[in-house]
Amino acid sequence: YRGPSNVLWRVGEGAWDSKKITDSLKALPTYGPLRPAGVTPADPQEAVAMMADGTSVSLRMEGVRWARPYRSDTLQGPTPRKVTDVVQTGQQIWVRQVGDAWWLAQVPDVNSALVSINPQNGAVMALVGGFDFNQSKFNRATQALRQVGSNIKPFLYTAAMDKGLTLASILNDVPIS
């Protein structure tokens, strides 16, 4: 977990009133199921988070247990033992509903693309160009200028096998004139 998106107010500086919290949250976008929220009170067992519409939701330990602190690409901190190890009063966080419960969430730092093709007829079954169109209008599946790298090998090898080539086949790799 990379931490809160913002600190709305610090404990000891005077808490914001409900209108100020909701006005701040209404200015933020939603990303798919992720909703911005402001942590009002937080204690070791539970944090209450106010949503942009003024409703409050409860974050319990099962909804924050996953949020080990991010240290580096290869290292995470310890598993939290209480809710306040993860969130504090005054922080702006992201939450999502899981069943009847609300869980802490975060907007991903990375995006990727996916093109799913039906191998029977070559039809495109799904094409995903990123995490959320409202976050980034750039479609990584159709607009990226990167080379496909090894992702294309299964298609090339399958086509070669369909033509009768094997792993032992020798091909003369000279320019065609």
Show where each model-derived region lies.
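Extended, non-catalytic substrate-recognition/exosite surfaces adjacent to catalytic cores, especially
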Residues: 1-177
